[in-house]
Amino acid sequence: MKEKSPQEKNAAERQVSLITEALSKAVDNKGVWLNEQGKQYPRFYPKGAAVSPFNALVMGLNSDKNGFSTNLYTLFSEAKKRDESVMAHERGVPFNWYAWNKYVNRHNPEDIISRKDYQELSATDQTQYKGIHNREIRVLFNIDQTMLPLKDKEKYEDVVKANVGANEDKALRSQVNDFIQKMKENLMAVRKDGSGVAHYDTEKDAVYIPKQENFEHYSDYVQEMLRQVVSATGHQQRLAREGMVMKNGIAPSEDAVKQEKLVVELASGIKMMEMGMPAKISKENMGLVDYWNRELKENPCLIDAIESDVNNALDAVSYTHLRAHETGR
């Protein structure tokens, strides 16, 4: 593995710190570890440019820890251009920025194309290529750390109002039902289960979820559904994550299984944040928090594996959801 730069090492330490602190807090917070205030998904201010799932996780955790009003962030230079400079002595949060200058064919390593050529491909053809990335660490600041709240209080309050608070119940349920329908049409079946136990059936390629009445809160039902969907992306026929795949008839190691459970909790939590809801650690996995925290702190490579697995899992889900909209389904 390529040696990390000092900036990458510092960023990784900060990312690990934010994740482990949040997981530890969940133990005494009824399992809630992310987006307790129901803020909307992290984005760049003011244009609203989207960010990767892992970056969104770090931005959301940083916002939670510091009590910021929104998950909206900006670069120091961009805030200065808007005459909304970052205030003195503020600490930013690391952002993993990838420069995708070249792309390689997933099935032919000798087929390498430029970014320009990649952008000219159809959405379907683009899926045949993956980026050859060069990672840079940028530093972002929440808009609460800028002069915006002081210089234009009314504008700031309007921005906060538009980016805080869970969706109205009817709209939220419609959003969740739409997501489930798109999963059924494009990724896997999502069915009701009478046994009372959520699970994924590999033979039927279907997720089974108990009725909503079996859960204390609607958000618990939604996140358990998301856990099962994320878990299903790791099976052999999809992303084949280490913790989900038999090799030569041998089951995954205990450590790999525990890491997979962390990926599922983080990825489903990020998706909950995208829907404007708080995320919880499941009761079944609460006992793994100390193990996860120890591994994240002691293994400097684990955070990179987590970033890759979380991004790939949610990209698989999001691409399927997006494709359904593009094809008019």
Question: PLM features: residue spans?
Answer:
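N-terminal accessory/interface modules of nucleic-acid-binding and processing proteins
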Residues: M1-R323
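A short, hydrophobic C-terminal helix/tail in secreted or cell-surface proteins
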Residues: A324-R329
